[in-house]
């Protein structure tokens, strides 16, 4: 279960998934990126 960290590209529907403590933000199109959820 690989995960990607802060600022890395992610796709919340099929992966790659963000590491624990991050969520996938798609506001900066065309890419989704992991942001800290704190």
UniProtKB/Swiss-Prot annotation:
This protein's record includes keyword Disulfide bond: yes
Keywords: Amidation, Disulfide bond, Ion channel impairing toxin, Knottin, Neurotoxin, Secreted, Toxin, Voltage-gated sodium channel impairing toxin
InterPro entries in the record: Beta/delta-agatoxin_fam (IPR016328)
Positions of disulphide bridges: 3-19, 10-24, 18-34, 26-32
Compartmental location: Secreted
Tissue: Expressed by the venom gland.
One GO cellular component, as annotated: extracellular region
Modified residues (Serine amide): 38
Chief place where the protein resides: secreted
GO molecular function: sodium channel regulator activity; toxin activity
Main function: Insecticidal neurotoxin that induces irreversible neuromuscular blockade in house crickets (A.domesticus). Modifies presynaptic voltage-gated sodium channels (Nav), causing them to open at the normal resting potential of the nerve. This leads to spontaneous release of neurotransmitter and repetitive action potentials in motor neurons.
Comment text on domains: The presence of a 'disulfide through disulfide knot' structurally defines this protein as a knottin.
Family named by the database record: Belongs to the neurotoxin 07 (Beta/delta-agtx) family. 02 (aga-3) subfamily.
Record-given protein name: Mu-agatoxin-Hc1c
Organism: Hololena curta
